[in-house]
Amino acid sequence: MKHPPCSVVAAATAILAVVLAIGGCSTEGDAGKASDTAATASNGDAAMLLKQATDAMRKVTGMHVRLAVTGDVPNLRVTKLEGDISNTPQTVATGSATLLVGNKSEDAKFVYVDGHLYSDLGQPGTYTDFGNGTSIYNVSVLLDPNKGLANLLANLKDASVAGSQQADGVATTKITGNSSADDIATLAGSRLTSEDVKTVPTTVWIASDGSSHLVQIQIAPTKDTSVTLTMSDWGKQVTATKPV
């Protein structure tokens, strides 16, 4: 069987590293500062809301995800992604993505099942087995209570409530703060900042309907860039079969 070009393999790898990878949030512009008085008053509320969101996220075993990237984010070839993922009884993901292959933008569908990533990248309608996904990126990390989105919520620093806002049609409370660059790298599968950067501006939108679900998260890895992950259908069970 003919092996796909290196550029295609790299792009397929990027699908994995984003499928469930980036769940980060908030642009520098979004992380606006409230007055000192308001900030002091909102810190306690932010801590409580983040605790509730962390607990809720740790219980999520499946969901729909939508990724959007603005600007040229270091080490990130995926510019857009939408799909479903669940980790019970095993990690399964399906969806579509837009990636940079060389200097060209290409659309591809993907299926992650039985520890393998299948994609029609470079060959629309014809799926290639890109091997054991866990050897490239541990796709279950997004829902991992200790390394994934729950960990990011639990360790958000300098958190402050920035008001109420509709996110993806859901009423939410917006919270701004900073995430560890190392935590972002763990979640993304690669470092999105230079080695000397310690924190990444992060914004989260938490559902205010009592569920405390994380609706959206955005990070600003470098100047004029952002990575936004929007979630819905929490608890969704995803099934998939190996593409023929």
UniProtKB/Swiss-Prot annotation:
PROSITE patterns: PROKAR_LIPOPROTEIN
One GO cellular component, as annotated: plasma membrane
Subcellular location: Cell membrane
Main location, first listed in the record: membrane
Keyword annotations of the record: Cell membrane, Lipoprotein, Membrane, Palmitate, Signal
Covalently attached lipid (N-palmitoyl cysteine), positions: C25
Ranges annotated as spanning the membrane: none
InterPro entries according to UniProt: LolA/LolB/LppX, LppX/LprAFG
Residues anchoring lipid (S-diacylglycerol cysteine): C25
Pfam family, any one: LppX_LprAFG
Membrane topology: Lipid-anchor
Superkingdom in the source lineage: Bacteria
Signal sequence, renumbered to the chain: 1-24
Sequence similarity: Belongs to the LppX/LprAFG lipoprotein family.
The protein, known as: Putative lipoprotein LprA
Organism, as annotated: Mycobacterium bovis (strain ATCC BAA-935 / AF2122/97)
High-level lineage: Bacteria, Bacillati, Actinomycetota, Actinomycetes, Mycobacteriales
Gene name as annotated: lprA
